[in-house]
């Protein structure tokens, strides 16, 4: 499953086994997985 992680340079590095994109949230940026 996808999980939220703090977005840095590459979301894929932060969440191995998943793929996502950096999305701006109200409090900074988070990496959210796409289906």
From Swiss-Prot:
Protein location: Secreted
Tissue: Expressed by the venom gland.
Keyword field: Disulfide bond, Ion channel impairing toxin, Neurotoxin, Potassium channel impairing toxin, Secreted, Toxin, Voltage-gated potassium channel impairing toxin
GO annotations of cellular component type: extracellular region
Entry-linked InterPro entries: Toxin_32 (IPR012636)
UniProt cross-references to Pfam families, sorted A to Z: Toxin_32
Cystines in this chain: 2-22, 7-31, 11-33
Primary localization: secreted
Molecular function GO labels: potassium channel inhibitor activity; toxin activity
Domain of life of the organism encoding this protein: Eukaryota
Family: Belongs to the short scorpion toxin superfamily. Potassium channel inhibitor family.
Function statement: Blocks Kv1.6/KCNA6 potassium channels.
Protein name: Tamulustoxin-2
Organism: Hottentotta tamulus (Eastern Indian scorpion)
Lineage: Eukaryota, Metazoa, Ecdysozoa, Arthropoda, Chelicerata
